[in-house]
Amino acid sequence: MLSRKRILLAALSLLCAGSLMAQNDFGVWTSVSAEKSFGKKFSIDAGVENRLQENATKPLRWDFGLGASYKVRKFLKLGAGYTYIRGRNLQEVKPRYKNDGVTLNGYNVDHEFWRNKHRLYFDVTGKVAWGRFTFSLRERYLYTHYNEAECLRDKYRTLVQPGYTGDTYIYNGTEFMEHELTTDQKKAKDKHALRSRLQVEYNIKGLPLNPYVSYEVTNDLGNQLRYDKSRVCAGLEWKVTKKHILDFGYIYQTESDNDEGNSNIHAIKVGYTFKF
């Protein structure tokens, strides 16, 4: 009887998990990078990344980055770099109200559009080893410049009044008397953020495998450290040889910032690094 109850509970848990997954998006993030070390302290790297979203059917962004790092001490490392980002902004809907601020008068519906971004980062990473575990904390400052962009915008205005017999336009279950397709100019802007990451890595004795888990949170420095996004990752680094490294992982990301979709996402990441 107890076994049946356990089986039933396990089945219900799986169903709940499946329901949760259905409410979130799924993506695949792939990356390729190269790294060159100059002695034991200084190294440079370059890499490209591609992210697919909407159940891994549509591109969300791709980027190219250059970076460098310097080990000040065995436990302390400094880093800096530049990343060019080509990102897709998803549809955004903003309700419009009358002067009273309460009565709905319509919607502005911005279509999807692509935007270029330029990012500089500076970081400090501290780490400590305990047995076969390595604990690390990275604090990264991000400066991102958003280029100007243009998108299509649907403007729905004026709710249908009693006795109206003209054309109507339906959006979000509401009928409107006016509709206009226009373009909207997105102004260039700058953003400053702090991204903190805590990671625990384990070195498996006798195997070239290092499983790890990490938690990362990003806060907006220009808005009183407002929460932007968080990311949980569980992965496995496989050192195939001294020069070839593979990285596999699962990511769950939640965000309040709508720059790239304002949604929760489950993602599988696959990365390859070549070390000169």
Which residues are covered by each model-predicted region?
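Bacterial N-terminal signal peptides that target proteins for export
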Residues: 1-8
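Flexible, solvent-exposed coil segments and beta strand-coil junctions
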Residues: 41-49, 85, 92-106, 171-180, ...
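Outer-membrane beta-barrel transmembrane domain signature
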Residues: 139-247, 251-255
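Repeated loop/turn-to-beta-strand initiation elements of outer-membrane beta-barrel proteins
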Residues: 41-46, 75-80, 131-135, 206-210, ...
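Sec/Tat signal peptide C-region and signal peptidase I cleavage site
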Residues: 18-22
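Residues that define the transmembrane beta-barrel architecture of outer-membrane proteins
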Residues: 26-28, 60-62, 116-120, 188-194, ...
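Residues on the lipid-exposed face of transmembrane beta-strands in outer-membrane beta-barrel proteins
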Residues: 32-36, 66-70, 122-126, 141, ...
